[in-house]
Amino acid sequence: MIKLIVGLGNPGAEYTATRHNAGFWLIDQLAREAGTTLRDERRFHGFYAKARLYGEEVHLLEPMTYMNRSGQSVVALAHFFKILPDQILVAHDELDLPPGTVKLKLGGGSGGHNGLKDISAHLSTQQYWRLRIGIGHPRDLIPDSARAGAKPDVANFVLKPPRKEEQDLIDASIERALAVMPVVVKGELERAMMQLHRNP
């Protein structure tokens, strides 16, 4: 059963619309669905709400520590409520998936994502659930003729807003993720994966 859903992003208005904040976008939607409001909770170093989602009690969290210190926030809440790593779902932007794609998985490496890297370090395990929201990779924007030897600027890419057509695809993928949340919060993760991965 999933007891904590974390969305990753950076605090501050200048980051709100950037690709790196896709995890925050999902949490904002979940809070709206639950009819609750995230509030600044200093002991958890983030914005937090206890929500009733689809008949289950779930903690929602947006760390306000900046991305590379997300683990500080996650572990503070997990320890306080005695939540185990495999009861945690972390929603984050995923460079290795195109916009419009969303995938669910348990464990694995960080794939260069500093938020995941810090969470794994603080939890002392990689065995927590991830909801990977595809944002695409900057290399995909380089013409084939210019790709040889090109070094895409990933840091700049994730800290910029998506183009409108990309945003529409990302929004649609978040809607698909929301559609499987009733199954996710009940702990039927394999079923949720089958439903989610049937679609691109």
UniProtKB/Swiss-Prot annotation:
Superkingdom of the source species: Bacteria
- What are its GO cellular component terms? cytoplasm
* Active-site residues from the entry: 20
Its EC number(s): 3.1.1.29
Site keyed Stabilizes the basic form of H active site to accept a proton: positions: 93
Protein residues bound to tRNA: 15, 66, 68, 114
Query: Pfam families attached here?
Result: Pept_tRNA_hydro
Q: Return the SUPFAM superfamilies for the record.
A: Peptidyl-tRNA hydrolase-like
Instruction: Cite a single GO MF annotation.
Output: peptidyl-tRNA hydrolase activity
Could you tell me what reaction this enzyme catalyses? an N-acyl-L-alpha-aminoacyl-tRNA + H2O = an N-acyl-L-amino acid + a tRNA + H(+)
Q: Where is it predominantly found?
A: cytoplasm
Site residues, Discriminates between blocked and unblocked aminoacyl-tRNA: 10
Q: Where in the cell is it found?
A: Cytoplasm
**What is the top EC class of this enzyme, as a single word?**
hydrolase
* This protein's UniProt keywords: Cytoplasm, Hydrolase, RNA-binding, tRNA-binding
Check the record and name the InterPro entries matching this protein: Pept_tRNA_hydro, Pept_tRNA_hydro_CS, Pept_tRNA_hydro_sf
Among HAMAP family, the record links this protein to: Pept_tRNA_hydro_bact
Q: What does this protein do?
A: Hydrolyzes ribosome-free peptidyl-tRNAs (with 1 or more amino acids incorporated), which drop off the ribosome during protein synthesis, or as a result of ribosome stalling. Catalyzes the release of premature peptidyl moieties from peptidyl-tRNA molecules trapped in stalled 50S ribosomal subunits, and thus maintains levels of free tRNAs and 50S ribosomes.
State what protein this is by name: Peptidyl-tRNA hydrolase
Organism equals: Paraburkholderia phymatum (strain DSM 17167 / CIP 108236 / LMG 21445 / STM815) (Burkholderia phymatum)
